[in-house]
């Protein structure tokens, strides 16, 4: 499933679909304070749903939305924060690549993980939008409204929204809808999504050999990176387990006589700190297997624990001193 989801995301990115969506939503939301920030967050949410790749979302929106926001007079710090936070939604909103990897490591159902992640992901997106609108309402200078002469007629705005939003929404429903309805497995839905991305590219007349070739190359490159991380991390985890590391950790946590909530707080602090210097792949494959036996010991719902980790990693990717999303934006 991972290579197919990656291919779908890269093809959607190369096809220019996201650019059309951003500018259409920006026009539709022109009456709201911080309309471009709202458009950027909605686009990040939809693009995350279509790809599940943090780096791709932040990088593309950095090239697409950030220059437009700065040119419109937006505060640079405000614009950067909007793009970084919106881009990190890809770690949580299905079909998140991270959740697929987590399901393999923890032997959990990817369907149930996706179902559990939808509400937190959309809730965070809604909170980000609420923050952006409120902040711009309180301090209009950080997000000036667009000039009235730049706004086209309503009929033209409606046409742009329909042309850009409906096809992408159909692709999202093809992927997520079939998974959540139990019609297809994640791998089958990913294959359907990849084929749907090809159809969308043809529909928008951007299905060029160069775009297709770049998407295949980036898919192979990213998949190879993830697989090598898997190999190294699984090797470490196997040796760690063979030498009794899991038993040492379990004995330590059980001997200090802590409650379930204290265990959750300790583990989330550890995950948060690890999110500064490490990518999510290393954290999941090396450290999560250490915590999984303890999750069962303390009687924590494994899907609840997975959501805590996903939310935590998203937060840590926004937090200095590392702030990986900021590095993606700067690059």
Model-derived segments and their meaning:
Residues 1-331:
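Alpha-helical transmembrane segments of multi-pass membrane transport proteins
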């Amino acid at each position: 499933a991972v290579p197919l989801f990656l291919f779908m995301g890269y093809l959607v990115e190369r096809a220019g679909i996201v650019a059309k969506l951003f500018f259409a939503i920006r026009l539709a939301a022109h009456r709201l304070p911080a309309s471009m920030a709202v458009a950027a967050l909605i686009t990040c949410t939809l693009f995350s749903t279509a790809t599940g790749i943090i780096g791709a979302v932040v990088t593309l929106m950095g090239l697409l939305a950030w220059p437009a926001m700065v040119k419109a007079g937006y505060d640079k710090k405000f614009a950067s924060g909007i793009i970084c936070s919106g881009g990190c939604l890809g770690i949580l909103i299905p079909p998140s690549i991270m959740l697929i990897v987590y399901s393999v490591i923890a032997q959990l159902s990817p369907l149930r993980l996706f179902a559990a992640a939808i509400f937190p992901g959309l809730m965070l997106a809604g909170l980000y939008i609420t923050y952006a609108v409120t902040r711009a309402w309180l301090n209009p200078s950080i997000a000036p409204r667009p000039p009235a002469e730049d706004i086209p007629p309503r009929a033209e705005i409606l046409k742009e929204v329909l042309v850009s939003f409906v096809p992408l929404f159909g692709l999202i429903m093809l992927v997520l809808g079939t998974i959540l309805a139990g019609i297809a497995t994640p791998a089958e839905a990913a294959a359907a999504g990849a084929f749907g991305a090809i159809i969308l590219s043809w529909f928008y007349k951007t299905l060029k050999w160069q775009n297709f070739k770049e998407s295949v190359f980036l898919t192979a490159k990213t998949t190879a990176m993830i697989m090598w991380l898997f190999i190294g991390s699984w090797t470490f985890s196997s040796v760690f387990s063979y030498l009794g590391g899991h038993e040492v950790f379990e004995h330590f946590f059980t001997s200090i006589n802590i409650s379930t909530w204290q265990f959750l707080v300790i583990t989330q602090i550890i995950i948060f700190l690890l999110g500064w210097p490490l990518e999510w792949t290393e954290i999941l494959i090396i450290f999560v297997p250490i915590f999984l036996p303890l999750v069962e010991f303390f009687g924590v719902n494994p899907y609840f624990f997975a959501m805590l980790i996903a939310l935590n990693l998203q937060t840590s990717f926004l937090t200095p001193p590392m702030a990986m999303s900021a590095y993606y934006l700067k690059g």
